[in-house]
């Protein structure tokens, strides 16, 4: 095969793809279990009939941006829309990352932050979370001071661990970061607070959101960012012409007419999350608290349930230490990983697909 090699810095990378398996219960990608209302489907079908398919869509997606702006009480000039929040993140990294620039994440966290950063040619530096997966201001300050990142990602609630970041920590990060701070809020509606109040034209912070989780629209691949006007202008520079098709635009506009349905759905998911957390804490599992629409847990070989994953000495079965450093725990991590894989397979054999989180550092044997 006369194959031409890809870039040297991409040779060790593989694609980021979640399994798609036909099973009765699919939980591995945190999609909404709730279908959109029938009225939404009806209204969208009518709106699709008005699309002029022989013409390019509105390049600026003005009506959609205005509708999102009204939802968050900002100006349309503070809104950037794209094909899922992943394209939002890619646009940020094309604008502010790249060769000679550094991107900071705090592991374990959403893997596409570092994945897209590397594709964009950025150098990625990883800070550490505490043993309970919270993030300390000292660690954030160390990473910002030592590495001077052009882009700093905070995921709140954090995927895959489930906790929202402390609002005071987010504010202090924004105040001290040398570059832009992106708060990934794909699951924000399930949590008690948001970083949106920090966004203004004098700040270097932006908040990314998605229609995939709370709006029951994962099939549409629609996301957006709320940021200062100068950042939206920069993102428009790197966006491809007519990048958001007409169908996505009308789907988003139509969905935003059903805010109350979305909010009821979120409330139902939160209630079910709390019920499930309560039940899981009676089982032989290590279970972490969640402020998202998923729960991180590790099957416990000792047969005793734990909450939060941290014992009084700060140790965990994956080898995490109370100082926030992590390893896969050597033999203990290998044993935990094997137990986790067996439970994952057992669930799959019974029609339930969950996420095996062992590929994240420090999450050997964990499932989500």
Model-derived features: positions:
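N-terminal "arm"/small-domain region of PLP-dependent enzymes with the aminotransferase-like
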Residues: 1-55, 148
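PLP-dependent aminotransferase class I/II
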Residues: 37, 204-281, 285-288
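Phosphate-binding glycine-rich loop
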Residues: 62-102
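Active-site phosphate-binding strand-loop segment of PLP-dependent enzymes
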Residues: 129-189
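Conserved PLP-binding catalytic core of the aspartate aminotransferase-like
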Residues: 270, 280-304, 332-350, 367
């Amino acid at each position: 095969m006369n194959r031409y090699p890809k870039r040297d810095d991409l040779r060790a990378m593989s694609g980021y793809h979640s399994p798609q398996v036909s099973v009765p219960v699919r939980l591995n990608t945190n999609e909404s279990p709730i279908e959109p209302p029938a009225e939404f489907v009806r209204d969208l079908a009518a709106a699709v009939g008005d699309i002029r398919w022989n013409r390019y869509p509105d390049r600026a997606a003005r009506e959609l941006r205005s509708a999102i702006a009204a939802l968050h009480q900002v100006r349309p000039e503070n809104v950037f829309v794209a094909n899922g929040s992943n394209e939002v993140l890619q646009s940020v990294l094309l604008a502010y990352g790249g060769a000679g620039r550094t991107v900071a994440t705090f592991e374990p966290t959403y893997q596409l932050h570092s994945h897209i950063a590397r594709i964009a040619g950025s150098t990625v530096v990883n800070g550490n979370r505490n043993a309970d997966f919270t993030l300390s201001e000292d660690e954030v300050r160390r990473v910002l001071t030592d590495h001077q990142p052009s882009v700093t990602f905070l995921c709140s609630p954090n995927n895959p661990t489930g906790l929202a970041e402390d609002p005071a920590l987010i504010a202090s990060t924004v105040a001290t970061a040398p570059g832009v701070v992106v708060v990934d809020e794909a699951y924000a509606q399930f949590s008690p607070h948001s970083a949106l109040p920090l966004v203004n034209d004098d700040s270097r912070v932006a908040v990314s959101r998605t229609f995939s989780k709370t709006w029951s629209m994962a099939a549409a691949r629609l996301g957006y960012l709320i940021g200062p006007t100068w950042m939206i202008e920069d993102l428009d520079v790197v966006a491809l012409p007519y990048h958001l098709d007409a169908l996505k635009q009308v789907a988003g506009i139509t969905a935003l007419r059903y805010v109350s349905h979305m909010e009821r759905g979120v409330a139902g998911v939160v209630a079910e999350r709390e019920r499930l957390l309560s039940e899981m804490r009676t089982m032989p599992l290590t279970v972490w608290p969640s402020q998202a629409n998923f729960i991180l847990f590790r099957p416990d070989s000792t047969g005793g349930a734990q909450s939060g994953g941290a014992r009084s000495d700060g140790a965990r079965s994956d080898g995490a230490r109370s100082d926030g450093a992590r390893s896969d725990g050597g033999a203990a991590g290998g044993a935990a990983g094997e137990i986790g894989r067996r439970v994952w397979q057992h669930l799959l054999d019974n029609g339930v697909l969950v996420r095996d989180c062992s590929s994240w550092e420090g999450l050997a044997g964990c499932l989500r």
